[in-house]
């Protein structure tokens, strides 16, 4: 049985799906740990080519003592999915007074289903409440209170 590799560090990055490059922030984050940025970028782009190009994808890179690495893709941030669903560039600067968009219950459910694997919520309803809170803090009006 092979010996387990010793983990040196874990690096959290957010990269555009299918469009990552060794330029900052990827190269400077991986370089000090001896990880080949072009090799990571190629593997990342291969694994994210089925996703919508440019969609921000969080990734956790685990670096081992022999300078090898592995990485885990996470689901896109809730704010990114909300902005995409509403068709807006950014949230409101004053979320209480200024509403910038409206999120339907169907859109809320769809986003919650996408995010559920990476959330601490145990049920879809709990995930919908979390996503609704994020939307409200962005100045997006949620169709129905949960």
Swiss-Prot record:
Gene Ontology molecular function: large ribosomal subunit rRNA binding; structural constituent of ribosome
GO annotation, biological process: translation
SUPFAM superfamilies associated with the record: Ribosomal L11/L12e N-terminal domain, Ribosomal protein L11, C-terminal domain
Keyword rRNA-binding assigned: yes
InterPro entries per UniProt: Ribosomal_uL11 (IPR000911), Ribosomal_uL11_bac-typ (IPR006519), Ribosomal_uL11_C (IPR020783), Ribosomal_uL11_C_sf (IPR036769), Ribosomal_uL11_CS (IPR020785), Ribosomal_uL11_N (IPR020784), Ribosomal_uL11_N_sf (IPR036796)
Claim: Isomerase is one of the keywords in the record: no
One GO cellular component term: cytosolic large ribosomal subunit
Modification note: One or more lysine residues are methylated.
Keywords assigned by UniProt, alphabetized: Methylation, Ribonucleoprotein, Ribosomal protein, RNA-binding, rRNA-binding
TM region(s), chain numbering: none
Record's function text: Forms part of the ribosomal stalk which helps the ribosome interact with GTP-bound translation factors.
Entry-linked HAMAP family: Ribosomal_uL11
Similarity-based family: Belongs to the universal ribosomal protein uL11 family.
Subunit details: Part of the ribosomal stalk of the 50S ribosomal subunit. Interacts with L10 and the large rRNA to form the base of the stalk. L10 forms an elongated spine to which L12 dimers bind in a sequential fashion forming a multimeric L10(L12)X complex.
Entries under PANTHER family matching the protein: 60S RIBOSOMAL PROTEIN L12 (PTHR11661), LARGE RIBOSOMAL SUBUNIT PROTEIN UL11M (PTHR11661:SF1)
UniProt-recorded name of the protein: Large ribosomal subunit protein uL11
